[in-house]
Structures are given as C-alpha cells and as structure tokens.
Amino acid sequence: MTARLTRRPGGPARLRALLDSGQTIVAPGAFDPLSARLVEEAGFPAVYMTGFGTSAALIGRPDVGLLTMTEMAGHAGRIAACVDIPLIADADTGYGNPLNVIRTVGAYEAAGAAGIHIEDQVAPKKCGHMEGKLVIPAEEMVQKVRAAVQARAQPDFVIIARTDARAVEGLERALQRARMYHQAGADALFIEALTSEAEAEAAVRAFPGVPLLFNWAEGGKTPPISLDRVKELGYRIVIFPISTLLAATGAMRRILREIAQAGTPAAAMSELPTFAEFVDFIGLPQVREAEQRYAVGTGPRTGSQTGADDGGDI
C-alpha cells in the first residue's frame, strides 16, 4: 500500500463491483483516517466508517445522535481521502425527513463515500445495540429510502437500508420492514441487533438474492458468530464497527499506565512502530517527493506561476 495525497475516484463503482462479484465484503470499522489506513494496510477490500467510533473520536461521547450530518459527512470525506478502498459510511437516520435525506446523500457522495446506510430509528437515534430505541413508521422510512435512491448522482452509489425494529417490534416485523425498504429501491439491507444465529439465518432466508449486511459488534446483542459461518449463511457485507476502536483504547491505556508507573514508555517500545516506520506509513515519502517536484527553481517559471503578470518581482 502506498499513501496517496489525493482521493482515488470511483469508489461507488468499485463497491458495486465487489457486491456484483458474489464475494463477501469484509469491512472493518474506522473511526478516523489513521485507522482507515490500517484497515487498508491489512488488505481488506473496503472500510466502514462507524458512527459509534466517530462520535467517540470527534466528541468523546456515546453514539446517541449528537453529531450533525455535516460533521459526519466531513469525517467521511477525511477518511475517503486517505484510502484507495471503498468507504461504506454510517449516515444514521439521514438526519431528518426525505428532504434532509436528499441533502445527506449529496453530502456523502461529494465527500467520496462509496455507499451509506440509513436507519429507521426516531431521532435522536441510539447505537443499535443500546436499549431504549424507537422506530419511525415504516411508510415514513420507505419515503426516505426512495428519496435516497433518487437523490444519488452516481447510479453505483450504494444505498443500504437499516431497520432497528428487531428490538422494538420483533423479528417478523423487522423482516417486513426490510422487505418494504428493498421494494423502495435499497441496494442492500441491514437488519440490526439480531439476537441469535437462528435469527441471522432466518434473515438471509427471507431475502434470497438480496445483499444483506451483518454487524459483528463486540459485546452487542448479536452473538459472536464466526466469520466463516457468517459467510456460509450468505451475508454479503460484514462490518466490524468497533474492533479497531476498542483495540486502540486498550493499547493507549496500556502505554499511559506504563508512563504513569515507570515514567517512560520504554518497556512497551518493542510493541510500537518506530518513528521512521510511522511517518513512512502516513505518507511522508510522498510529501517529500511532491515537495521536490514543485520546489521553486526546479522548473520553468512564468508570470502566471509566480503570480506576476509583467515579469516583475512580487
């Protein structure tokens, strides 16, 4: 993997091609650009921008609907700009009614996301594995999905409809809602917080040929089913939204404890990348190359390049 200074175009088309290939897309969660780069370095075909992790990273607060659409789309743009793999992003409830959803789709597309999921929770929403969720009427969500599908400028931009109704209305009603959302034009479905492997299997059986997303969340309501089994069941997208966030939190706690107790992180240095390795990873060689390429005096100078239109000094 080589660090880029600009975003690679065509994310929606590449995500659509992955969906059309029949393979299961494994997309670990990223909570910032650095974690997204690590997902890419590990060889995954796509990355997922976690709303839970974004809320924790940006404002240090839980995922309870505190972030705005512009904050979320802006964060998606920063992540998309630093990786070559497609970005699937959490777009919460779409941030309002169908008119708001139209603006949301445009903002995430402009940011460089390859696809988004929107959910049928009442705003302000909660993390899908928290208690106390409420859902809007299914017919209202249908209009949001229709608006999202019709608003996208790129036909390949992937719209994933998520239902949180399992925890509120039960599995059968959640499946009914998901069917309505698919009929409204959603490209894929996300039935959140299933409570057993049997429910996960039932969801796939209910939608033959329709891409379904499986949410593998540590400590959540869905049991820890192996990735091989999730693939065997037929899920087409698998996200691990908080794995990197929890791992980073644990690692930072360990190093901070070492500094607090020993006065130095020396005991943990063998587990850390070196400074040189880290700056190479985040793209310093590419920055240096660009500095040399565009350094003053390395190429012909014209009035327009120097800012002078008469050949004089500026």
Task: Describe each model-derived feature in a short phrase.
Residues 6-18, 25-214, 220-235:
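Alpha/beta enzyme core
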Residues 20-22, 241:
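Short glycine-enriched loop/turn motifs at secondary-structure junctions
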Residues 24-25, 265:
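A general structural signal for well-ordered secondary-structure junctions
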Residues 216-303, 307-314:
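C-terminal alpha-helical cap/extension of soluble enzyme domains
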